[in-house]
Amino acid sequence: MELFSLSSLLLLSTLFVFYIFKFVFKRRNQRNCYMLHYECYKGMEERKLDTETCAKVVQRNKNLGLEEYRFLLRTMASSGIGEETYGPRNVLEGREDSPTLLDAHSEMDEIMFDTLDKLFHKTKGSISPSDIDILVVNVSLFAPSPSLTSRVINRYKMREDIKSYNLSGLGCSASVISIDIVQRMFETRENALALVVSTETMGPHWYCGKDRSMMLSNCLFRAGGSSVLLTNAARFKNQALMKLVTVVRAHVGSDDEAYSCCIQMEDRDGHPGFLLTKYLKKAAARALTKNLQVLLPRVLPVKELIRYAIVRALKRRTSAKREPASSGIGLNLKTGLQHFCIHPGGRAIIEGVGKSLGLTEFDIEPARMALHRFGNTSSGGLWYVLGYMEAKNRLKKGEKILMMSMGAGFESNNCVWEVLKDLDDKNVWEDSVDRYPELSRIPNPFVEKYDWINDDTMSFVRVD
């Protein structure tokens, strides 16, 4: 009898341990987030904003005087944006001062459905729209009813039990926020498939006034977007491009200057637009610092963290100037990260992040080239940078990529991906990647063609 009781107890204990291990293993698998595929939007030839087209758009704004023209053309010439970015249809048609709801819907449909059609075509035979369990769409400045997620669900006839999330007002860093939401959803759903669609409406929000701080958005932002397919299903692991390592979000919106440095508003004449203040760079640096203070200890080797701590301690003892721990000065990020996917928000942002983190020209090249070829495409911009890395055959199995995004709020949302196999898809860069980085070194046509506007002897001229 005692032997039977002992055997029963041993059996129960074994079963208990087995189910504990099974539960832990299952939870660990559910927390996995694999990237199966991503697609970026590339517009048609007639949608390109070259020198001539940009000049015509500027000249149509009758609110501008000579000084405003000078400011705009100087900004365009120094923006780091090339001749082949894409603009919204209503602006190219000369209707930027009278956009319609149809313009906004048409712009969204073109970008969302183009990227999703290509994505489903690539996964045809293994994944269909009816297999999608989670859908997240992030567009900051356009929140219609029915929602954009409903528009996608209707177009692709997705299941009735799909979990959909429509995000607005989150700026250029919204794509990483969407990935964070998906990862958290994966913890409660087994063998799930998720779509993240990231884009922005440019046409209805083109600024037609003369406030210099609000003109900047016209010079930087362009039409673009992306769709990303994610899963936590182990059966897709061998097909996956990358695996999510970690996500960190930082929000410094409690500071008034950080909150208002990038904000939608009307100017004194009632023209709506997006205000970018001189505090933007400082807010970005602060948010990025807060973020990296949490993220870097998760991905850098202990040996490098100990070395850095010792160096900082010695500096303190010798009364050396104290450097911020997360700035990258003295901390070798290459010990745990091989690639740096910086949000292509503007030349100053890219170069500022690169300098503060001690990155090389090679490291920031993908962001600079994405800005030159496609412009600032808001939350979708990171995926053009990633696409450049892949098209250049830079991404090898086992390497890690740090994605850094910043946006209104002010927020810094970063994530790290591990490459699961060598990647070489030419994607949206197929027709231009071989011309880069050389193409970006060609002098901006604005400088040569409109240099006369900087001549002070021409100040008496009236431009209309």
Swiss-Prot record:
Keyword Transmembrane helix: yes
Membrane topology: Single-pass membrane protein
Induction: Repressed by herbicides such as flufenacet and benfuresate. Down-regulated by low temperature, osmotic stress, salt and darkness.
InterPro entries, A to Z: 3-ktacl-CoA_syn, ACP_syn_III_C, FAE1_typ3_polyketide_synth, Thiolase-like
The EC number(s) this enzyme carries: 2.3.1.199
Pfam family, one: ACP_syn_III_C
Transmembrane parts of this sequence: 3-25
Enzyme class of the recorded protein, top EC level: transferase
Compartment(s) where it occurs, according to its Swiss-Prot or TrEMBL record: Membrane
GO annotations of cellular component type: membrane
Residue stretches making up the FAE domain: 24-318
Major localisation: membrane
One of the GO biological process terms: response to cold
UniProt KW keywords: Acyltransferase, Membrane, Transferase, Transmembrane, Transmembrane helix
Single GO term (MF): fatty acid elongase activity
Active site: 172, 251, 339, 343, 372, 376
Catalytic function, reaction form: a very-long-chain acyl-CoA + malonyl-CoA + H(+) = a very-long-chain 3-oxoacyl-CoA + CO2 + CoA
Pathway: Lipid metabolism; fatty acid biosynthesis
Tissues expressing this chain: Expressed in siliques.
Family: Belongs to the thiolase-like superfamily. Chalcone/stilbene synthases family.
PANTHER family in the record: 3-KETOACYL-COA SYNTHASE
Name used for this protein in its record: 3-ketoacyl-CoA synthase 19
Lineage: Eukaryota, Viridiplantae, Streptophyta, Embryophyta, Tracheophyta
